[in-house]
């Protein structure tokens, strides 16, 4: 059996949870539970509430996902 392709969507971190888990609100309004990918954990990339992230969802369970990328904030600091 071939591995099914993951679905990539964007969303916003709502709240951090224990064990590197996060509640993420997707752009379409759905809320999913997501954990950090291994490379992000290895490189100590910090994720805070309000950050925009890319989440991979399995086609089998659309309520859980993996955070694969954190987009840079474009807000200017004064």
Swiss-Prot record:
Pfam families: eIF-1a. InterPro entries: NA-bd_OB-fold (IPR012340), RNA-binding_domain_S1_IF1 (IPR006196), S1_domain (IPR003029), TIF_IF1 (IPR004368). The lineage of its organism: Bacteria, Pseudomonadati, Thermodesulfobacteriota, Desulfobulbia, Desulfobulbales. Belongs to the IF-1 family. Keywords: Cytoplasm, Initiation factor, Protein biosynthesis, RNA-binding, rRNA-binding. This is Translation initiation factor IF-1. It comes from the Bacteria. GO terms for cellular component: cytosol.
């Amino acid at each position: 059996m071939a591995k099914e392709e993951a679905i990539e969507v964007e969303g916003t971190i709502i709240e951090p949870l224990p064990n590197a888990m996060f509640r993420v609100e997707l752009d379409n309004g759905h809320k999913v539970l997501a954990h950090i990918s291994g490379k992000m954990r290895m490189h100590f990339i910090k994720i805070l509430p309000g950050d925009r992230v890319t989440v991979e969802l399995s086609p089998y369970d659309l309520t859980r996902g993996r955070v694969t990328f954190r987009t840079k904030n474009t807000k200017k600091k004064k």
